[in-house]
């Protein structure tokens, strides 16, 4: 996540869960003026505040109805490749639902919060359900070499296309080969270089 997560709280009934989550995530608690007495950041207009956070790329955990979050960010939704995580949590902590940015941190965020609250996250992205991993969100130590091909790769995998994994002798990259699709000069049946080992320290 690019910036500190904002935990959004509209009223006193949601405050205990919101406070618990913000402490657990070391995140800022954003509370509505006049309804919440303790917060790191106060706001008066909920819709305007949500829209601004979303536009600024800040992950949002809203301890409120999903509809509030959806209406708040609706006009700011433009590119799924860059949208921040948006997660809804029921006021009583009984449900955790990643709404947007599932493969940009929302699913992982929902899992962490769910573990804290002792509930199961309501994750709906097909890759996570079928394979237990976000195909465009590699495990730690890897980066995605060609994100532009994720959609076609995912669709093929979900359709049951056979998969073969190959690596160079140094294991510096992993090539995920799907069926007979080719890339480049066609000398290899590589669908694309899905993951490569990150050179980051």
Predicted segments, located by residue:
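SAM-dependent methyltransferases
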Residues: 1-60, 72-83, 89-201
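Short His-Asn-centered micro-motif
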Residues: 62-66
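Short glycine-rich, flexible loops that bind phosphorylated cofactors or substrates
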Residues: 68-70
């Amino acid at each position: 996540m690019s910036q500190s997560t904002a935990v959004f709280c509209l009223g006193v009934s949601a405050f205990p869960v919101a406070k618990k989550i913000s402490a657990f995530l070391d995140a800022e608690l954003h509370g509505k003026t006049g309804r919440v007495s303790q917060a790191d950041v106060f706001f008066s207009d909920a819709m305007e505040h949500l829209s601004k956070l979303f536009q600024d790329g800040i992950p949002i955990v809203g301890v409120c109805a999903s509809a509030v979050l959806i209406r708040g960010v609706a006009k700011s939704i433009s590119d799924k490749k860059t949208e921040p995580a948006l997660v809804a949590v029921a006021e009583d902590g009984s449900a955790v639902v990643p709404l947007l940015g599932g493969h940009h941190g929302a699913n992982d965020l929902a899992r962490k919060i769910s573990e804290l609250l002792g509930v199961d996250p309501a994750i709906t992205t097909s890759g996570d359900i079928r394979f237990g991993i976000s195909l465009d969100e590699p495990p730690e130590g890897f980066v995605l070499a060609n994100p532009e091909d994720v959609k076609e790769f995912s669709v093929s995998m979900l359709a049951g296309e056979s998969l073969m994994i190959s690596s160079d002798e140094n294991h510096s990259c992993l090539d995920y080969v799907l069926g007979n699709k080719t890339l480049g000069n066609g000398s290899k049946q590589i669908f694309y270089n899905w993951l490569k080992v990150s050179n980051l320290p």
